[in-house]
Amino acid sequence: MKQHTICPLNDILPETGVCALIDGKQIAIFRTKKNDLFAIDNYDPFSQANVLSRGLIGGTTIVNEAGMDEEVLYVASPIYKQRFNLATGQCLDDVDVTLAAYQVMLNKDTVMLQGV
């Protein structure tokens, strides 16, 4: 799989997201306050706009498939506020909607994306 260089880690402030254009596709990349990195599609299917990189990062508890409580991080769309799991792209407010999630990693201090 091809890896894409996105930006230096310091270009993404903690608790924010940025948008990267890769082969004509917009990808939202997020950095948490613990410096974890996540990447999902930037397109919000509810507002039909490429805005998720400007959403707010939050956390909540969900019941997973095993019936256990699980802490998840999400991004809330800046338009209609639907929440998307940062790790999986699953919409927490509509189980029928899932965005693509991508593998994001650090190479030294450079953010890299794989799987687009």
Regions found by a protein language model. Name each.
Residues 1-22:
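Zn-dependent metallo-beta-lactamase
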Residues 19-116:
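Rieske [2Fe-2S] iron-sulfur-binding domain
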